Amino acid sequence: MLGLIGKKVGMTQVFQGNGVVVPVTVIEFEPNYIIGKKTVERDGYDALIMGSVDLKSSKISKPIKGQYKNLENVEPKKYVIEFKGLKGYDAGDEVGLDAFKEIKYVDITGTTKGKGFQGAMKRHNFSGGPSSHGSKFHRHLGSTGQAATPSRTFKGTKMAGRMGGEQQTIQNLEVVFIDEEKRAILVKGAVPGVKGSFVIVKKAKKVGV
């Protein structure tokens, strides 16, 4: 499935021809290069390995150098992603925004904002206890288990804990505008992650669902 590695710049708004305001997220793309291929004969499936953003020289180890020794004019990359089912490219090729020209909707994967340790009301949208006088708890979790049977708290019970910092995919975001000169696209709505975080933009898997 076709995709690119981009950077979330932030949100803004644009006006459509009829005057309707549309909130959009700006995603910027540095050059994306094909740095490797997988084939059915050798690996059991077809895929392209794509990289973006040059790695700092202090971070380049000998094993990493070895992976790029057969690629001309392609520096080791910081972000490396595998896209399955893609053909038609060779190692060293650059994939640009023209890949999205005919695409109306995209799926975007990013890492959500980290919120730190949060209570059950914020983390799981619990309603909490009564706020009135005489109540013994207001924002506490409450009971997490049963009586003598089974006499324990089950794994996976919703509790307070670390919130955010997880991979999340938003599907069917409309591509509002493609700016090839600035190597950026505008998509309708919000995208997971903080400003400056890197995201994976793919052709929508379930358009119109």
Curated annotation (Swiss-Prot):
Gene Ontology BP term (one): translation
Molecular function terms from GO: rRNA binding; structural constituent of ribosome
One Pfam family named in its UniProt record: Ribosomal_L3
Keyword Nucleotide-binding recorded: no
Family statement drawn from the similarity comment of this UniProt entry: Belongs to the universal ribosomal protein uL3 family.
Protein function: One of the primary rRNA binding proteins, it binds directly near the 3'-end of the 23S rRNA, where it nucleates assembly of the 50S subunit.
Protein name: Large ribosomal subunit protein uL3
Lineage start: Bacteria, Pseudomonadati, Spirochaetota, Spirochaetia, Spirochaetales
